[in-house]
Amino acid sequence: LLDYFNKEKIKNNISIPSNLVKSKYTQSCFNDYGNSYDRICIAYKKNSSKKTIEQIQAQIRYNKDVMNTCRKKQNKIDKELSLLFKNLERKEWGKLPLGSLKDQDPDAHYYPITYEFADKSRAQLGCYSIYSKTALKIGVYNLEFGKVIRK
């Protein structure tokens, strides 16, 4: 991470989601980064001086609940990913609750699609509904980080 951002920018952009609060990970998010997505988030170990990237995620955030729009975009990207990852195991999980948000937003849910690599790391594409707003998130994470976010 330090090859791309300085320590001050990383520190000033820390944004910890509820599923990472009690973990050994944190993340920094950068808005308006790139042309295709309006936000990227990069997770790393809290006490790591090297700030090795454990997950990278790009997001398109919608200011309202537009799940149908998100799902259409998700399906389009999924078709591209299925060509890129044709030898990987693909799983469409259906609608799942976001357990880490159940106290703040009991209706929070998402529709993940994953591609699993040989080392059990994953690429994931999902449409999320949180606080009546929709977000498309696409990312790649290693196995160790995956175990934390699957809880």
Stretch-by-stretch model annotation:
Residues 1-52:
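N-terminal leader/targeting segments
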Residues 10, 14-16, 40-42, 53-56, ...:
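Weak global preference for isoleucine
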Residues 23, 35, 63-64, 121:
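Processing junctions and N-termini across compartments
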Residues 37-104:
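Long, charged/polar, surface-exposed segments that mediate recognition or autoinhibition
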Residues 75-150:
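A charged, solvent-exposed segment within the mature domains of Sec-exported extracytoplasmic proteins
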